[in-house]
Amino acid sequence: MNPLSVGNQAPAFTLLNQQEKFVSLSDFRGKKVLIYFYPKALTPGCTTQACGLRDSKSELDVLGLVVLGISPDAPKKLAQFIEKKELNFTLLSDPDHQVAEQFGVWGEKKFMGRTYDGIHRISFLINESGTIMQVFDKFKIKDHHQMIIDYLRSL
């Protein structure tokens, strides 16, 4: 696994959202975008991370940030995640993990003595022209949203 780094151009992509509508990164040209990769909808860690972003949405809006969550889950599962947890941002389905691979976040993981391939929990902050301006790869899940807010405030 070799995640993209600061200064790299974010790869162009188009994925289905929770409403089974196509969303492209280029739709947000001219805006700052947080692309956060997470392993699986409606699991404890992913729910904590998503709810932190949900609860910070008004502040993230003031800071001019668009939030896009990407996982291998199907659009129907993403819709359930949004409904059950009242999420207020877009989730995208990457079932074949092609976008995760382009960003370098798909790779070997170990959990409970088992080794498998999956998404690593890494977030990319992309500037208005599509360049990666920050990579968040070491954080406590419960602090993810605050770390992003603190970074944006420091600019």
Curated annotation (Swiss-Prot):
Thiol-specific peroxidase that catalyzes the reduction of hydrogen peroxide and organic hydroperoxides to water and alcohols, respectively. Plays a role in cell protection against oxidative stress by detoxifying peroxides and as sensor of hydrogen peroxide-mediated signaling events. It comes from Haemophilus influenzae (strain ATCC 51907 / DSM 11121 / KW20 / Rd). Pfam families: AhpC-TSA. InterPro entries: AhpC/TSA (IPR000866), Peroxiredoxin_BCP/PrxQ (IPR050924), Thioredoxin-like_sf (IPR036249), Thioredoxin_domain (IPR013766). Belongs to the peroxiredoxin family. BCP/PrxQ subfamily. The active site is a conserved redox-active cysteine residue, the peroxidatic cysteine (C(P)), which makes the nucleophilic attack on the peroxide substrate. The peroxide oxidizes the C(P)-SH to cysteine sulfenic acid (C(P)-SOH), which then reacts with another cysteine residue, the resolving cysteine (C(R)), to form a disulfide bridge. The disulfide is subsequently reduced by an appropriate electron donor to complete the catalytic cycle. In this atypical 2-Cys peroxiredoxin, C(R) is present in the same subunit to form an intramolecular disulfide. This is Putative peroxiredoxin bcp. GO terms for cellular component: cytoplasm. Keywords: Antioxidant, Disulfide bond, Oxidoreductase, Peroxidase, Redox-active center. It is an enzyme of class 1 (oxidoreductase).
